Amino acid sequence: MEKKLNEPDESNSKELQTLDEEGKPDLSKDQEEDNKGPIKLSRKVRYILFVIIVSTELFMNNSSGLLSSSSIAIKKQFNLGDKDFGLLGTSQGIGRVCGNLLYIYFNNKLSAKVILSFSLITKGALAIIFKFSNNFNILVFVRGIVAIFRMPPSIYCGVWIDQFGIQKYKTIMMSTIPMVQTGGKMLGFLYHIIVGEENWSLGFVIQGSFMIFIGVIITLFPKIYFSAKIKAIEKTEENKERITDFEFTQRTKEIKADKKQSSLKQFFSDVYELVSNPIWSISMTGRALLFGITTTIHFWVSDYMKNVILIKDKREVFVIYSAISILGPLGGVICNSIVNPLIGGYEKKKASYAAIMLHMAEVICGMSMAFLRNKISFLILTLLYFLFDSSVIGIINGINISSVRPEIKATGFSIANLVTHSLCSGPGPFLYGFVNDKYKEKFMGAGMLCMMFICAMDIPIFIIMTIIRNRILDKKEKEKEEKLINKDNEEGKI
């Protein structure tokens, strides 16, 4: 009996091991690192899940590319100015705010699998309905409703990578998110080319069909692949024979109680914990500005090429937009694959320094874009802008999510998105259009320059974050060393 309580059951532990293709336990060093997470799965399964989760970002962003590429046709059809057209982007921002609030509420009530599949299928159905809107006000309203169901998958993507991603490649996996998002916008641009200028709304039917398809695929997977809490309960049940009845009951109660903490008091407690965490608060502020400006530039870049750079051939616009959407973020992933070994991952101190330097390069490129009228120079600088942007967002996302305990990561990320879309990416397209309408007679790149001045505000924000973060990390390291010294001293006395 004593042996059962103190020694691991070899038969049960073998069942928990990951098996390779030959059915033998795979105990490589990297695999052991991966298995420190909440789920023990083979890398093959992790990669499949990663592709499915990230593909939701690919198809959700099609609508942004569709609207951007169809700006002239939409403005002509509904007789709109830049300010009015910007309302389509702003309504999306308002919808995202509502989507964040709903996600925060339902996160602890429903499983991640249910939230993901329902959001994707509903968004797909609404995107198809978008095709039949002939009134601009209805178009703006439906655009906002569609954006509500966009947020849960978008929030969960980063959370899933942080919790279940392959340990060695987490920074790179985080960097693929902006790449896939811009790739999705480019795909929306491609829909526009396929269906034609006058039939731009048909592109939403294509997008909606893909969204429903991905949502149905997710329903086919076990829900334990999307929820660490469910897996934790199963692990406790599997190990029931190796612990006492009291321990089993306590662990199960704690896990289930944590899952049901959806009361208003608990929510405000979580929010207070997040806001009082300086690393989370400051990185969230910087991320909000950065993401808001990037979203606005993506919304307007096609219109900018047509009306400021004066590229009239829509196929040429598509080629340049595609290059920006694919090569820029892809370069960011490559950049982070080089930077990641040097900084040791986004949990380390060097990550903050890397974010500052990369963002300074991003601001320089962005400021220069507003003064250029040559399409080759514009293409090169825009590519560099999105390359640096993708790198910075990957690092900042990692710093933000990893700065809080696992139980409130999803809540923290959803609140960060709430702030981003309510204060930055929501008003961004409208602000760009407003500035452009007012000052474009004096300076054609007025809207772009305004956005880049706001983007530059992130430099002092990231510097402050770095100073505070370094102090906190130094304090934790010192406490860790003191514990080791005390432990050695106690062992020496014994």
Label every model-predicted segment:
Residues 114-128, 350-367:
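Structural signature of the two symmetry-related core transmembrane helices
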Residues 2-62:
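Cytosolic juxtamembrane N-terminal segment immediately preceding the first transmembrane helix
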Residues 98-136:
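Conserved MFS/SLC helix-loop-helix module at the cytosolic interface between two early adjacent transmembrane helices
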Residues 48-82, 297-302:
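Extracytoplasmic
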Residues 67-68, 277-336, 393, 397, ...:
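Extracytoplasmic gate region of multi-pass secondary transporters
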Residues 65, 92-101, 151, 185-186, ...:
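Residue-level signature of mid-helix packing/kink "hotspots" within the transmembrane helices
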